[in-house]
């Protein structure tokens, strides 16, 4: 597993995030589009700063290039998923102890499995949420690779969600 970077301290910047969110809403700017743009800019910076290991999203032209990009994102998501699982064990316990929540061979497995999320410290609960956000970064990269906007994501999600409900109505 990759080194676990604790992120709960990032909440100290929540006032700035609150202002940015309110400003976008006030100006009728889609927050999802803002996040996609922010992630795209990060990917461009990574491509410029570290071109040996990062592609510029605009350079993805062929099905093979997009496939390789998507597979990389899946690998990164898998790594972040393991970090998410570990964070469910309470990172304040230390990474080794926290991993007992998903390792059935560990002595404290049952105890960690039974622990309520609400009983974790506020910092540990934040850590869980930040690990999910880490996954979301890489999932947004998939949308970026396919050139999808927030509007297109919403519309296609809306249509697919309606179809999923219709399938249930048809006994799917």
Curated annotation (Swiss-Prot):
EC number(s) from the headed UniProt entry: 3.6.1.12
Catalytic reaction list: dCTP + H2O = dCMP + diphosphate + H(+)
Enzyme class: hydrolase
Swiss-Prot/TrEMBL keywords: Hydrolase
GO MF term list: dCTP diphosphatase activity
Top-level taxon in the UniProt lineage: Viruses
Name listed for the protein in its UniProt record: dCTP pyrophosphatase
Protein source organism: Enterobacteria phage LZ5 (Bacteriophage LZ5)
Organism taxonomic ancestry: Viruses, Duplodnaviria, Heunggongvirae, Uroviricota, Caudoviricetes
Recorded name of the encoding gene: 56
